[in-house]
């Protein structure tokens, strides 16, 4: 039985857990678009250690619904086996929110069919494998938009010892 659990929680500790969900494995979110910015419920002070993710779109994922912000996250000593992407950061223009102070270290990845790490700030709702299989092309030129509160921001992301 496939089940996704979404909760509002602060200071979570996710340790020695196994995920096999067929979607994003360990996924941090904090609200969507204007409603997420208005509520301002930051997903923060997260510790993920010693977890294993089988299959799915991403092993560790932030977004795409991250308008309230995500900060102070430590991910270490995990295995991602057969996920489409290992580390996946996604959002889109108009969403807003700040993702910052993310530390990722000692991650083992096997049988990843696309990239070990992706940042997609024009996320359209499809996994990396779905985009590749569809033959869709990334537009050669994206219409520039002004930087404002609806512009997502990713900063201070540290990655070390990926194998």
What are the roles of these predicted feature ranges?
Residues 1-163:
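Extracellular/periplasmic carbohydrate-active domains that bind, remodel
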